[in-house]
């Protein structure tokens, strides 16, 4: 394991030296309130430029992303990020803007935001969108804030519950809890779909809404979605669409046509913008017309003289993000939508579904697939067979995949499947790449039967071997010891 950068520090080893300065020195304490002055110099590492470059290049070579290889992380839609989108976001007219510029000087940017909103409305079947939320979970929060504001505006103050399926993303109950809602779990039926009878039993005048992903986290389409919407609406609740799995229906079906009232998109999933450290993300929120007044302000509007920011929205929940959202991400997503168009988005969806079913079909002999039927963009396999017969867990299988050069799938989720392996291949993967993954998974299944210990100790070829995850969670070391308390 390489040293942390502090351990490489050498006194006097800095890489830059300032030329002599002919400006008279001042006493800092005479100009700055001593309360804001450091008593000691910060403990920063001292290294030459080449050592800093080598340190971070070495670390970067350990990273794994979609540009390195296959990344089948279920429910994360790790698709290729077209590099032309980066070019678009770096155009000087976008990259050099400042959010405090007057509206008349940023008409191009406002037009892009206006057009991006219209595209989102068309794709989602919604009437208005806000582009402010900075991530998927942030979009969830914004959407539930809108639902809460709607009920409060109607003086329907008894609606303090949010329904969440037992297969839902963990952010759904977490978001509802943050906003003070009581979370009520709705059971799945034997098909892996929302149990309509249980939903009906959960509905009441205290329910503000139901959060739903469609396709769900099993990769299955909620075929009774229209009846689900009817049940929720009949009792005065609203239907929220978590857009995490939009890639399974984009260009083919629209949440707004299914009865959803509020939704969020993940631009960093469905629309080809980077995830995580390559991001940031973006989670635009769309609503039907009767909820549009509650959207965060400002919204971009158009008049004869041009585009402008509309703050005159008395029912608005207010801003949920500084300025106007992660603008560069929106530029990239807009470029992606415009490049593919409607037919291209539909084809991308169809290829994602094809790839998912191709993997499911070829892995069904070696791995248990609890809901083994036509799926959408992802499916859930299970390591139950390997655990029962050979003592090899899903975690062992996932770690071993790293030795074969693949990022592991999502593991142990959804919670309703024991030893779950949630696999999402996305549309940008070739058949040849999928065949390589199938071969690796089959070889791991053989190893589980013939040499299970090799899986128990995996990974073997990575720089960092198997991490003690329990110890890392319970005894984290978050600071370099030289900086003080751990």
Curated annotation (Swiss-Prot):
GO terms for biological process: glycine decarboxylation via glycine cleavage system. Transmembrane segments: none annotated. Coiled coil: none annotated. The keyword Oxidoreductase applies. Disulfide bonds: none annotated. The gene is gcvPB. NCBIfam families: PRK04366.1. This is Probable glycine dehydrogenase (decarboxylating) subunit 2. Pfam families: GcvP2_C, GDC-P. It comes from Syntrophomonas wolfei subsp. wolfei (strain DSM 2245B / Goettingen). The keyword Methyltransferase does not apply.
């Amino acid at each position: 394991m390489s040293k942390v950068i502090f351990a490489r520090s050498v006194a006097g080893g800095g890489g830059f030296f300032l030329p002599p300065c002919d400006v008279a020195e001042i006493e800092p304490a005479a100009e700055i309130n001593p309360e804001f002055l450091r008593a000691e110099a910060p403990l920063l590492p001292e290294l030459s430029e080449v050592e800093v470059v080598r340190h971070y290049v070495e670390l970067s070579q350990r990273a794994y992303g979609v540009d390195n290889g296959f990344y089948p992380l279920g429910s994360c839609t790790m698709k290729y990020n077209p590099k032309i989108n980066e070019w678009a976001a770096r155009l000087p007219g976008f990259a050099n803007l400042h959010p405090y510029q007057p509206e008349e000087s940023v008409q191009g940017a406002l037009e892009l935001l206006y057009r991006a909103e219209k595209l989102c409305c068309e794709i989602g079947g919604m009437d208005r969108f806000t582009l402010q939320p900075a991530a998927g979970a942030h979009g969830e929060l914004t959407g539930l804030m809108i639902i809460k504001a709607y009920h409060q505006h109607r003086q329907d103050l008894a609606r303090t519950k949010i329904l969440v399926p037992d297969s839902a993303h963990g952010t759904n109950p977490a978001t509802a809890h943050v906003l003070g809602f009581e979370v009520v779990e709705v059971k799945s039926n034997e098909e892996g779909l929302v149990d309509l009878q249980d939903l009906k039993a959960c509905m009441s005048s205290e329910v503000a809404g139901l959060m739903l992903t469609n396709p769900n986290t099993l990769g299955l389409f909620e075929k009774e979605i229209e009846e689900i919407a009817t049940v929720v609406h009949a009792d005065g609740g609203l239907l929220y669409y978590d857009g995490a799995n939009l890639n399974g229906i984009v260009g083919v079906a629209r949440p707004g046509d299914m009865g959803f009232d509020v939704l969020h998109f993940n631009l960093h999933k469905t629309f080809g913008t980077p995830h995580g450290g390559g991001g940031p993300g973006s989670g635009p929120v769309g609503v039907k017309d009767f909820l549009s007044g509650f959207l965060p302000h400002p919204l971009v509007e158009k008049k004869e003289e041009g585009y402008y920011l509309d703050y005159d929205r008395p029912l608005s929940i207010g801003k949920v993000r500084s300025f106007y959202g992660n603008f560069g991400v929106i530029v990239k997503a807009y470029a992606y939508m415009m490049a593919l168009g409607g037919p291209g988005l539909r084809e991308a969806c169809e290829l994602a579904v094809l790839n998912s079913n191709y993997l499911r079909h070829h892995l069904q002999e070696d791995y248990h697939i609890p809901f083994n039927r036509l799926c959408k963009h992802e499916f859930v396999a299970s390591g139950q067979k390997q655990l029962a017969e050979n003592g090899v867990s899903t975690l062992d299988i996932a770690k071993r995949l790293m030795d074969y050069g693949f990022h592991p799938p999502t593991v142990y989720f959804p919670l309703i499947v024991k030893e779950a392996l949630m696999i999402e291949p996305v549309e940008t993967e070739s058949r040849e790449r999928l065949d390589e993954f199938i071969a690796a998974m089959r070889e791991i299944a053989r190893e589980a039967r013939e040499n299970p210990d090799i899986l128990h100790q995996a990974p073997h070829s990575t720089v960092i071997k198997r991490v003690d995850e329990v110890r890392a969670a319970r005894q984290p070391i978050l600071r370099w010891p030289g900086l003080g308390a751990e």
